[in-house]
Amino acid sequence: MAERENRRDRRDDRSREETPEFADRLVAINRVSKTVKGGKRFGFAALVVVGDQRGRVGFGKGKAKEVPEAIRKATEQAKRQMIRVALRDGRTLHHDQEGRHGAGKVVMRAAVPGTGIIAGGPMRAVFEMLGIQDVVAKSLGSQNPYNMIRATMDGLKRESSPRQVAQRRGKKVADILKKPEAEVAEA
């Protein structure tokens, strides 16, 4: 009996250790209203970005009558919808990328060390929660924070590491990273 309890305690400890601590960022909070027979009912909608700052990020929307409840719902949804993104040297993207959602378009570029996060509003929150330190991004089209975050996430989902590209093409990573002979001759 004691041995069984001991195992359970170890399992509980392990699950607590394995659960990474997530950072979250409130991107937008809107007061919304619903017109009913007796007048207007007010509520709140929250948009939250959650990440472990080591390559995982997610976003969520939550609606409730009170702000803290809306934020809690959005945070829970964001944790359920997390994606993993391959980062180069744990600080930037592997390649330039474009993401789209609705009328929103986002262009993201890998940057050299020391550049910092050059991005506006909601995109900056996504990059910070993801753990990216150097990136240049530009939002074109819709400036709606929901569309900007979805477009950013679309671009990040398309991001692939040299290992993933090599695996897809059936080649070695060294072949993918090697410069073609024509470029070497010009330089």
Swiss-Prot record:
A single Gene Ontology CC annotation of this entry is: small ribosomal subunit
Q: Which InterPro entries match?
A: Ribosomal_Su5_D2-typ_SF (IPR020568), Ribosomal_uS5 (IPR000851), Ribosomal_uS5_bac-type (IPR005712), Ribosomal_uS5_C (IPR005324), Ribosomal_uS5_N (IPR013810), Ribosomal_uS5_N_CS (IPR018192), Ribsml_uS5_D2-typ_fold_subgr (IPR014721)
Q: Which GO BP terms apply?
A: translation
Identify a single GO molecular function assigned to this protein: rRNA binding
Q: Which domain of life is it from?
A: Bacteria
Give one Pfam hit by family name.
Ribosomal_S5
Record keywords:
Ribonucleoprotein, Ribosomal protein, RNA-binding, rRNA-binding
Output the SUPFAM superfamilies linked to this UniProt entry.
Answer: dsRNA-binding domain-like, Ribosomal protein S5 domain 2-like
Q: Where is this region: Disordered?
A: 1-20
Gene3D superfamilies for this protein = 3.30.160.20, 3.30.230.10
Q: Where are the transmembrane segments?
A: none
Domain S5 DRBM, chain residue ranges per copy: 22-85
The function of this protein is: With S4 and S12 plays an important role in translational accuracy.
**Family, similarity comment:** Belongs to the universal ribosomal protein uS5 family.
Task: Return the PANTHER family for the record.
Answer: MITOCHONDRIAL RIBOSOMAL PROTEIN S5
* Annotated domain remarks: The N-terminal domain interacts with the head of the 30S subunit; the C-terminal domain interacts with the body and contacts protein S4. The interaction surface between S4 and S5 is involved in control of translational fidelity.
Q: How does it assemble?
A: Part of the 30S ribosomal subunit. Contacts proteins S4 and S8.
Protein name (record) = Small ribosomal subunit protein uS5
Give the organism, scientific name: Cereibacter sphaeroides (strain ATCC 17023 / DSM 158 / JCM 6121 / CCUG 31486 / LMG 2827 / NBRC 12203 / NCIMB 8253 / ATH 2.4.1.)
